[in-house]
Amino acid sequence: MSRLYTNTGKLARFILRRNRIRIPVWIVSIVSFTIMIGAMLPELYPTSIERQMMAETLKNPAVTFMVGPGYGLDNYTDGAMMAHYMLAFTAVTVGIMNILLTATHTREDEEYGRIEMIRSLPAGPLSPLTAAFLILIITNVIIFLTVAFGLYSLGFESIDLGGSLLYGASLGAIGIFFSALTGFFAQLTTNNRSTIGYSFGFLIIAYIARGIGDVENEILSLISPLGLILRTQVYVNNYWWPVLVTVGVSVVLFGLALYLNSVRDLGSGFIPTKPGRSKGSVFLSSPLGLSLRLQRTPIIAWVIGMFILGVSYG
């Protein structure tokens, strides 16, 4: 059994070296943005009257669809406001980070022949996938801890340690979930574009299902990982069970990904690739058109991420 994971640690360190700039940029961006918003909200709405006026907006179905259901509206604190307006959008951003990083070190590495080269060395067949998961888990744990203690360090009464730990844990759990999900899709598909496409498709469906469920049917919200994580009711009731359920589902997905990786051939997948067009578009005849076509998926991913970031600003 141990030979399946030979030199996983060395591969993990290699992944860290490849991402010595990318991962820190993601972490610093997410953490600093979260703490900045946490520091700004009490200054924007310093009185209880102003906060109660904001609480009334959460009764609007459109707002509920965007950010999730409101909790603690009778005594709307800075912490409750922070969680209501930021947790869903930040969770989506963390999900995007995990999708892109996991796809890069699973299906993309396999598509470009890097995994084949690694397997020619003394490395276990499951070591590349395990190393990628290990690095993403560590990355999400760092986000969890830095967000939690960063928010607590602001010193606001309603942004307490327990709620801050749960806020950070919610982000870490949703990140681990989307990393495991992307690793699972990487085993089903045959190319990196499909892996990212399926993963982002699931993210979009999960967000829409959460929105509809929060407005009309809570069952849809509980099925969606984004809706489930909002049931933590951070800084109000501080429920930990959604985090535990999310991590549990992630473990199952991780196990399935490892199993599928062990039974399939290198470079293959379980979902057949549709045949391409017999003739290329005229648009592809120019260098710009070809570049846009090749980078279509990352561009769409970044547009979605920036749109969500803009919506969170407001």
Each model region followed by its residue ranges:
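Selective transmembrane-helix segments that form parts of the transport pathway or gating/packing helices
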Residues: N19-I27, P125-Y152, I299
